Each structure stands twice: as C-alpha cells, then as structure tokens.
Amino acid sequence: MAIEGVLNEGFVTTTADKLINWTRTGSLWPMTFGLACCAVEMMHAGASRYDLDRFGVVFRPSPRQSDVMIVAGTLCNKMAPALRKVYDQMAEPRWVISMGSCANGGGYYHYSYSVVRGCDRIVPVDVYVPGCPPTAEALIYGIIQLQAKIRRTNTIARKA
C-alpha cells in the first residue's frame, strides 16, 4: 500500500481507493473450475510447496463465497452454460483467471467441433496464464498480476 504521509501523532493517511484495493489483494478467494489436466497444477499451487495461503488466496467451495474464478482446462460447448451460471452467482467485484492453453484459446483441441475456443467468449477474463499445462509458478505469477491489476482499479466513483 502506498502511503502518502505519516504524521508525528501516529496517524497514517492514504486514499480510500488504495486501502480498499490493498485489502482486496490480500484476501482473494478463488473458486476452482478445474476441467482437465491444468486443474492438477492448480492443486499443486495450493499444496505445501507453493502455499497460496501466504498470498491470502484461500480456495472456496461455493461461488457465492468467492471473488476469483480460475478456469483450468478444456471448456466444451456443453459446459459453457454452467461456467456462465457459476460466474453469475459470484459476488461483485469478481475476477477470472484463464489457466492453460485450452482455457485461453482451445489449445490442442482448438479445431474440435465441441470445444469453446477460449473461455473469454463466455466470461470476461482478467488474466491469462499460458502453458500446457502451466506450472504452479505460472499460476502464482498470474495471481500476482491479478493483484497488481486490482491495485490499479478505482473503487470509488468520482464526480465528472
């Protein structure tokens, strides 16, 4: 958190935007939407070697309790409405991480008739994590990029 000034009396001053965004970056609660082999790497990122808890990332079982969706794997046409329904059940503000080549653009199965060529056709994506499958380090880097994106957003509406 960038602090504009520290007074001698023990007060810290900052903008409300920076305070709210700082708290949001430290408490990301993703809902896993693991569809294929990328989900295994997502599980590795939550295990003890990488430990996403130190970033404030705690996996939640319900979309109503989460603010981040990690789409990991091949999205087929039959699963696309379910993805959209789960996304709509998430509370605002919400973010989406597209993990892996299949979620990003169809991947190896791009020309199949039953595969959606990127989950960004169904839900708005904030961060793309490349790879087939991407490593746990790549997912952690994607989460850090999402935290940087959240820090740059304006949360309080300004009068024009």
UniProtKB/Swiss-Prot annotation:
Topology in membrane: Peripheral membrane protein
Any one GO biological process: electron transport coupled proton transport
PROSITE patterns tied to this protein: COMPLEX1_20K
Amino acids binding [4Fe-4S] cluster: 37-38, 102, 132
Subcellular location: Cell inner membrane
Bound cofactor: record note: Binds 1 [4Fe-4S] cluster.
Cofactor: [4Fe-4S] cluster
Catalytic class of the enzyme: translocase
One Gene Ontology term of the molecular function aspect: NADH:ubiquinone reductase (non-electrogenic) activity
Pfam families, per the entry: Oxidored_q6 (PF01058)
Disulfide bonds listed in the record: none
EC number: 7.1.1.-
Highest taxon above the source species: Bacteria
Protein keywords: 4Fe-4S, Cell inner membrane, Cell membrane, Iron, Iron-sulfur, Membrane, Metal-binding, NAD, Quinone, Translocase, Transport, Ubiquinone
Any GO CC annotation of this UniProt entry: plasma membrane
PANTHER family according to UniProt: NADH DEHYDROGENASE (PTHR11995), NADH DEHYDROGENASE [UBIQUINONE] IRON-SULFUR PROTEIN 7, MITOCHONDRIAL (PTHR11995:SF14)
Complex formation: NDH-1 is composed of 14 different subunits. Subunits NuoB, C, D, E, F, and G constitute the peripheral sector of the complex.
HAMAP family: NDH1_NuoB
Protein family membership: Belongs to the complex I 20 kDa subunit family.
Function (record text): NDH-1 shuttles electrons from NADH, via FMN and iron-sulfur (Fe-S) centers, to quinones in the respiratory chain. Couples the redox reaction to proton translocation (for every two electrons transferred, four hydrogen ions are translocated across the cytoplasmic membrane), and thus conserves the redox energy in a proton gradient.
Protein's recorded name: NADH-quinone oxidoreductase subunit B
Record organism: Ralstonia pickettii (strain 12J)
Lineage, highest ranks first: Bacteria, Pseudomonadati, Pseudomonadota, Betaproteobacteria, Burkholderiales
